[in-house]
């Protein structure tokens, strides 16, 4: 959160009770605090991946079948506990405070599908995704994401950004979305 959302570490450490481990315990910790706005919580892919895979996640290694099964179960449990869904990042713009890429940057289709199936298992939730849409190109990555969504039958929302180096990318993504709907 310090690197991606630019929230200072002291604010995070002082503002949250860090005695929880599961997503349900996290939601309970949030409920104990006074808050002035309504919000929903999504299970974040980065911490999920690091929790399951450890250093292998930070080294951008591929998840194995055991990792995927565990992430699927944790996702289903999180949604049943109250998570609105799952969020992932596939953009080089999101980096840790140390400037390293997020552990989710190049997560493979099998991993994303496994996690998405956790939403299906729970019968609820959506996927939120931020991407550069460049692995290797927007149409190919969108096709992969579409297969993930078809496997789980849950909705997807994604950030639509204008890029200086690809001025029509947003229109291309809207066209791909229209074709998918």
Predicted stretch roles:
Residues 81, 86-181:
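Active-site core of metal-dependent hydrolases
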């Amino acid at each position: 959160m310090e690197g991606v959302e630019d929230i200072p570490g002291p604010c995070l450490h002082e503002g949250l009770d860090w005695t929880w481990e599961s997503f349900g315990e996290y939601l309970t910790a949030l409920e104990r605090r006074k808050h002035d706005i309504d919000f929903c919580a999504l299970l974040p892919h980065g911490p999920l991946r690091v929790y399951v895979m450890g250093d292998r996640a930070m080294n951008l290694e591929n998840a194995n079948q055991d990792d995927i099964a565990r992430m699927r179960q944790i996702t289903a449990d999180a949604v049943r506990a109250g998570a609105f869904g799952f969020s992932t990042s596939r953009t080089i713009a999101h980096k840790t405070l140390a400037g390293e890429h997020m552990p989710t940057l190049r997560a493979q289709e099998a991993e994303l599908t496994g996690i998405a199936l956790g939403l299906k298992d729970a019968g609820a939730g959506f996927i939120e995704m931020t991407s550069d849409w460049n692995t290797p190109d927007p149409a190919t990555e969108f096709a992969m994401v579409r297969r993930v969504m078809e496997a789980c039958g849950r909705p997807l929302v994604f950030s639509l950004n204008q890029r200086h180096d690809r001025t029509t990318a947003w229109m291309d993504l809207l066209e791909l979305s229209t074709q998918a709907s």
